[in-house]
A protein has these predicted regions:
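Membrane-embedded alpha-helical bundles that constitute the cytochrome b-like, heme-associated redox core
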Residues: 1-272
Length: 272
């Protein structure tokens, strides 16, 4: 499960890179939604064919989410077997730092579920926003129109022009949670997340009994924490600069194309 969870991110990272390029970087360069549409169509020939979309987009996403949920269930089962499901009052819990277990003797009921980390929590939130994004931009056109050949950056711009509040909430959540989850996820895979943290208490970072070395370790943890969070903020800002700064301001589509877009949004209760 751990390998599936990890290796599924490789294909998703390639897709995400292409998607950021076409929905943010290229619009930033061209400063125009119509001028950017052609590049998006070219990219679709790579990741939106009948063969590549299931293999390199849909399957990795499904595998990543399913394996993440399965890992939590497995760890819960292991906790129950290790500490005994019949004695929840003495179920060990993670300390406030989340690094180690400590036995409880206060008689309160404890959960066997593993602690929900920031990476996991952001992943579940991201999955919800991503599901809505896929439903509106991919599944809805297929269901209503039979294909999605007319769906592109102009469709997104039309959504922002017609329903700005819903669109901004959806895309801010998608970009913020998505970039945070992906950056911290990769930091975990390469071993940086385990060395990052702002907390500087002895329980969190431990002690070497050398005051100078302890200070250096705490400073290093904080530097790594700042670098990872800074990378997440930078990634979000780059994506938002083109996506929200250019595409979202592209204005509504007109003519029969605009009518098609209105009918699609009306199908999910977003009519005028």
């Amino acid at each position: 499960m751990t390998r599936i969870h990890r290796y599924s991110t490789y294909a998703l990272s390639i897709f995400t890179g292409l998607h950021i390029a076409n929905t943010s970087i290229i619009p930033l360069v061209t400063r125009s939604v119509p001028a950017s549409e052609g590049y998006l169509l070219l990219a679709r020939e790579i990741y939106q064919t009948p063969m590549t979309e299931p293999l390199f987009v849909a399957l990795p996403i499904a595998a990543h989410i399913a394996s993440g949920i399965a890992l939590r269930l497995v760890r819960r089962s292991q906790n129950l077997k290790r500490y005994g499901g019949a004695t929840p009052a003495v179920m060990p819990t993670r300390s406030s730092t989340g690094r180690s277990f400590s036995s409880s003797s206060d008689g309160s009921s404890r959960s066997a579920w593993p602690q929900l980390s920031w990476v996991s929590a952001s992943g579940y939130g991201f999955a919800a926003f991503l599901s809505a994004h896929v439903a509106i931009n991919r599944l809805l056109p297929l269901h209503v129109e039979g294909d999605s050949s007319n769906i592109g950056l102009a469709y997104v711009a039309h959504g922002f022009a017609s329903h700005p509040a819903v669109s901004y909430v959806a895309y801010v959540g998608l970009l913020g949670l998505g970039c945070g989850h992906m950056v911290w996820g990769w930091a975990k895979w390469i071993g940086l997340a385990q060395m990052a943290g702002w907390a500087a208490d002895i329980k969190t970072v431990g002690t070497t009994r050398d005051r100078n070395e302890d200070v250096r370790r705490r400073k290093r943890r904080r530097r790594i924490w700042l670098w990872v969070n800074g990378t997440a903020v930078a990634a979000t800002a780059i994506w938002a600069a083109g996506g929200l700064g250019i595409v979202a301001r592209g204005g509504p589509a007109h003519g029969w194309v605009g009518k098609v877009y209105d009918e699609l949004f009306a199908a999910v209760g977003l009519g005028h």
